From Swiss-Prot:
Probable heterodimer composed of AptA and AptB. The keyword Zinc does not apply. GO terms for molecular function: transferase activity. This is Apulose-4-phosphate transketolase subunit B. CDD domains: TPP_PYR_DXS_TK_like. SUPFAM superfamilies: Thiamin diphosphate-binding fold (THDP-binding), TK C-terminal domain-like. It comes from Actinobacillus succinogenes (strain ATCC 55618 / DSM 22257 / CCUG 43843 / 130Z). Involved in catabolism of D-apiose. Catalyzes the transfer of the glycolaldehyde group from apulose-4-phosphate to D-glyceraldehyde 3-phosphate, generating dihydroxyacetone phosphate and D-xylulose-5-phosphate. Disulfide bonds: none annotated. Pfam families: Transket_pyr, Transketolase_C. Pathway: Carbohydrate metabolism. Keywords: Carbohydrate metabolism, Thiamine pyrophosphate, Transferase. Its cofactor is thiamine diphosphate.
Amino acid sequence: MSNAEHLANIMVERFISAVKNGVDLVPVVADSTSTAKIAPFIKEFPDRLVNVGIAEQSLVGCAAGLALGGKVAVTCNAAPFLISRANEQVKVDVCYNNTNVKLFGLNSGASYGPLASTHHSIDDIGVMRGFGNIQIFAPSSPNECRQIIDYAINYVGPVYIRLDGKELPEIHNDDYEFVPGQIDVLRKGGKIALVAMGSTVYEIVDAAVKLAEKGIEVTVVNVPSIRPCDTEALFNAIKDCKYVISVEEHNINGGVGSLVAEVIAEHGAPITLKRRGIADGGYALAGDRKSMRKHHGIDADSIVDLALSLN
C-alpha cells in the first residue's frame, strides 16, 4: 500500500476537472472552505462557489434549489454537521424531491479524533440508508475515490459520499474499475471473510497480510457501494466461509455490518458474523486514531487476534 492521498484533495481535483469539461457544477460550503480544501477550485473559478456560513440547513436547501435550477450542486462540509444539523433538509429537499445534489460527508467517522463526539460521525451511513432515492458510497482508496466522484457528478440524482479526514493509502491497481453496486473482492480463500467499507478497508488488507504470514488465508471484501449494492455478489463472496468479521469506523448498527447481517439472514446461511465498530449505544473514543481503533477492535492487529481466535 502506497501513494497515500487526502480524499478531499481528490474531491476538489474532480470538481475542477468537471467544470473544465463543461459540467455546470456549483460547490456549496458552510464556512467549510478549509475542511473542504477547496482553495484550488476558488482560484480557478472564484465566482462559482456559494458559502452560506455556519448554517447547514441553508447549505442543503440552497444546494437543492441550485439543482432544481439545473446546476450540479455539491455540498462540502463536515459529515457530523451535515448529518445532524441538516437532517430534515437532506430528507425532504434532497432525497424526497430526488434533486441532483451530491452530498460529501467530509472528515467522517472519528477523523476529528480528540474533538470527540460533537465532531465524530459514526451514524451517517445508517441515517442515509433510512432515506429513499439517494445512492451511498464509501471510497476506500484514492483510485476508487476518483472513480466514485466522477460517477456521482455524471449521475442524475442524490448521492452521499463518505470521505475520511486523513490520507488513505492506495490499495487498488491502476486497472481497477469501479462499478456502482459492485463488491470488490481483494483476496479470496479460507474459512474467514473480512468485510469493510471506506477507511477501514486498508486495516483488513493489512490484517490479511499478517494472517497470511501465519499461514492463514482469508477472504477480503471491500464494499464501496452501500446503495446500490449487489447483495447476491456480496453473499457469493462470503458464502463458503464459516465466519465473517465486519469492520467499520461507524456504529455497528446501520453500516456495513448491518448490511452483511441482512444478507446472511435473508439467505438463511449458517455463517457466524462478528461485527466490529463502535458498539451499540456507544461513542467513538476521543483521542488519536490509532488508540481509538485499537480500543474499538478495528485496527489490523485486533482483527488478526479475532481471526486467530476463530481459526
